[in-house]
Amino acid sequence: MLFSKLFAPTLKEPPKDAVLKSHKHLAQAGYIYQIGSGIYNFLPLAKKVLDKIENITHKRMQEHGAQNILMSFVVLASLWEKSGRLDKYGKELLVFKDRKGNDFVLSPTLEENITEIAANFIKSYKQLPVHLYQIHTKFRDEIRPRFGLVRAREFIMKDGYSFHEDAESLDKEFLNTQSAYKEILNDLGLDFRIVEADNGAIGGSKSKEFVVLTECGEDTIVVCQNCDYAANIEIAKRSKRLEPLNVPKAQLAKFPTPNTTSAESVAEFFKVEPFFVLKAVVKKVIHKDKETLACFFTRGDDNLEETKALNALNVLGANALELREASQEDLNQVGLVAGFIGPYGLRKHVSYIIFDEDLKEGDCLIAGANEKDFHAVGVDLKGFENLIYADIIQVKESDCCPNCQRALKYHKSLEVGHIFKLSQGYAKSLKASFLDKNGKEQFFEMGCYGIGISRLLSAILEQKSDDLGCVWTKNTAPFDVVIVVSNLKDEVQKKLAFEVYERLLQRGVDVLLDDRDVRFGAKMRDFELIGERLALIVGKQTLENKEFECIKRANLEKQTLKDRELEEKILEILESE
């Protein structure tokens, strides 16, 4: 490719609203162009990188037995109604009507669509298992699109779905796809982790995320520094904590505690560890057609993890869509006083009460007395009937691993893949069944598997690039080599550059010849910005000594290559990087 023919509209400065370096570099280097909030055009350089990522993905998925299909981007809303996700997904789901008044959605995921296909064409256990996947455009109407391709509204995704006759077969495919995803991310040269994760709006019985470690990541993962335990903070667990030695022994009594509304101030007032303070967190629960209140109790030195709390409510059959902060007015309406809420008589005030599992058998506690400026001491939860316990706290870095009891540590990360065991949920709601070996009708066991293809462009750059511009990995750079002519007016240099260009093309090198009539410094700046893996300089030294200066983009390391061994050395460097 000749640079003079390449459509790569580089900018002098990155967009002013760009925060992440990946967004800055992709826009400034002419990879992407934004045409709306969270909506981007992929220009030739980006398309080359996308093609390389997609080719790797196709190769690995098909090696693991998956079949490539292409499904409609537009889906009947009635299918989403049947699955129950039309309301659950919320405003991120874009719903529209056609000219005849029929409701459709722009799909963020396609569980409903693929289940409809399976229900119509897979009739017997003999056709199972089957794993179908696609790479296609998706749309999620993000309330605050940001960070370029990291949180876009329109994006490219690889999504796959598998159908099975039993849970054992699903388990095997879950592990098979996990292996395929590991190979894909290894091929892309990424440093990643596989972590236990929340199922979210997709649902199912189990899921794992594939996350890239980067300080700008949106997510926090909790990782053991000793064993292989790793989980998204939304579901991370810890081992049971040891009780502090200075237990505040007291008979049940009510004490005046003026202006002590936080767990920390209560602990300080009574000269005890926050561990013994019962912290109450009241949330407004949003259902499809109503709002209720729920109270969650944790120890005073713990914080509520809202995803865990929402899941705990739904285990109780709450069908909650989301949790919101309860206002002072919400509390006043049910007769509660913020900062003094406790378990005594609470059931008449709120619809749901859940205690963190760390409070089981808890005694010697201090809790709100449900009266302004009063707390109760000597609270023993064993004296209450039918309390509901669940894991609802956010794990802290000081907590210990649930597997080996060693210290846990936070890492910032960016999710690039997610795999789920859906079990029979979608099959039952959409009535997708087959005949088993005994001729009996059974619902499919399902799995679903996704990789954010367009997000991977940002993930690679967040992990690999520097302040100068894009640094791509071995298998993702738009070009392996850019040939830079020091003085294009020197016909000998120009002729030699074209000769080297042809020599490298014949050896299968993906090469770009910068034949533009611009300053040498500008060409080198574009090399740093765009991120070809190597720059090969044709200049006076080349003519005088038959030597080329070669610069690696990853670390800007320079070396001299002899003309007689040029192709072999270039191939050797490209293979080793």
UniProtKB/Swiss-Prot annotation:
- What would be one Pfam family of this protein? tRNA_edit
Q: Assembly and partners?
A: Homodimer.
GO aspect biological process, one term: prolyl-tRNA aminoacylation
Q: Which UniProt keywords apply?
A: Aminoacyl-tRNA synthetase, ATP-binding, Cytoplasm, Ligase, Nucleotide-binding, Protein biosynthesis
The answer to whether the entry has keyword Ubl conjugation is no
Name the Enzyme Commission number(s) assigned to this protein.
6.1.1.15
InterPro entries hit by this protein? aa-tRNA-synt_IIb, aa-tRNA-synth_II, aa-tRNA-synth_II/BPL/LPL, Anticodon-bd, Anticodon-bd_dom_sf, Pro-tRNA-ligase_IIa, Pro-tRNA-synth_IIa_bac-type, Pro-tRNA-Synthase_IIa_type1
Gene Ontology molecular function, alphabetical: aminoacyl-tRNA deacylase activity; ATP binding; proline-tRNA ligase activity
Please indicate if the UniProt record lists Cytoplasm as a keyword. yes
Could you say which protein family the record assigns here? Belongs to the class-II aminoacyl-tRNA synthetase family. ProS type 1 subfamily.
EC class name: ligase
Query: What protein name does the entry list?
Result: Proline--tRNA ligase
- Supply the SUPFAM superfamilies for this chain: Class II aaRS ABD-related, Class II aaRS and biotin synthetases, YbaK/ProRS associated domain
The protein's job, in short, is:
Catalyzes the attachment of proline to tRNA(Pro) in a two-step reaction: proline is first activated by ATP to form Pro-AMP and then transferred to the acceptor end of tRNA(Pro). As ProRS can inadvertently accommodate and process non-cognate amino acids such as alanine and cysteine, to avoid such errors it has two additional distinct editing activities against alanine. One activity is designated as 'pretransfer' editing and involves the tRNA(Pro)-independent hydrolysis of activated Ala-AMP.
* Chief place of localization: cytoplasm
Q: List, alphabetically, the GO terms of the cellular component aspect.
A: cytosol
> What catalytic activity does the UniProt entry give for this protein?
tRNA(Pro) + L-proline + ATP = L-prolyl-tRNA(Pro) + AMP + diphosphate
Domain remark in the UniProt entry: Consists of three domains: the N-terminal catalytic domain, the editing domain and the C-terminal anticodon-binding domain.
Superkingdom of origin organism = Bacteria
Q: From the Swiss-Prot or TrEMBL record, state where the protein is found.
A: Cytoplasm
